[in-house]
């Protein structure tokens, strides 16, 4: 399959979280096919509230989607990711439900500097594979009133919300109307209750691609090469 853009995700592929999240969002990035969504509170149209994040699947972004630079190939990007992952150590964290700028996500229960350091390393070391942002992409990003630092990141690194502005999160909804926020919060907590507050171990990264269907598909999952501190 040919892809329009690529990204580096954390995807808990062998975990209950992935099964729950794929069912919640309605898309399975590993199988590359729709996932059946369960019915929840009758006041909520789950298909509607998950429409925006659905195509990305259950994930946390480590390096945001980018076009492939001229002169490099997907296989070269995959090899470099594998080499990079050999130097990475597993990271422990737990999750809770949070509201971020009007949408809901799963976020770490405590600030995790190790995840931020991993993000920084991945963004920098794989940047040679990223094509510069197009004029249309720059216009689109700048509609969000970027700070000077964010605009500089956009120009230099292709994405504004990195490094100090990076925030590890697993998106579960689009923007939710105020009158539904409490109900949506309750439903998310109920649905994901089996995995909330549990310890997760990030021990692999995924290379994903955006197909011409607009959905993201897993190209490869790459395990970390270093042992956990424990």
Language model features: what each stretch is:
Residues 192, 201-209:
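Low-complexity, intrinsically disordered Gly/Pro/Thr-rich segments
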């Amino acid at each position: 399959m040919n892809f329009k853009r690529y990204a580096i995700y954390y995807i808990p592929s062998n975990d209950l979280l992935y099964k729950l999240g794929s069912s919640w969002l309605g898309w399975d990035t590993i199988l590359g096919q729709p996932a059946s969504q369960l019915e929840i509170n009758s006041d909520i149209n789950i298909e509607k509230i998950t429409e925006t994040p659905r195509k990305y699947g259950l994930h946390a972004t480590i390096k945001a989607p980018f076009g492939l630079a001229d002169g490099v190939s997907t296989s070269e990007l995959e090899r470099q990711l594998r080499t990079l992952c050999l130097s990475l150590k597993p990271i422990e964290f737990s999750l809770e439900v949070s509201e971020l700028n009007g949408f809901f996500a799963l976020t770490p229960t405590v600030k995790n500097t190790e995840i931020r350091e991993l993000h920084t390393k991945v963004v920098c070391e794989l940047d040679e594979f990223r094509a510069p942002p197009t004029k249309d992409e720059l216009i689109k990003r700048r509609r969000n009133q970027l700070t000077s630092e964010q605009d500089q990141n956009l120009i230099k690194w292709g994405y504004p919300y990195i490094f100090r502005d990076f925030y590890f999160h697993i998106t579960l909804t689009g923007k939710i109307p105020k009158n539904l926020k409490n109900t949506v919060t309750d439903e998310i907590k109920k649905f994901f209750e089996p995995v909330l507050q549990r310890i997760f171990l990030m021990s692999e990264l995924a290379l994903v691609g955006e197909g011409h269907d607009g959905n993201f598909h897993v190209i490869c999952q790459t395990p970390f090469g270093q042992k956990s501190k424990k």
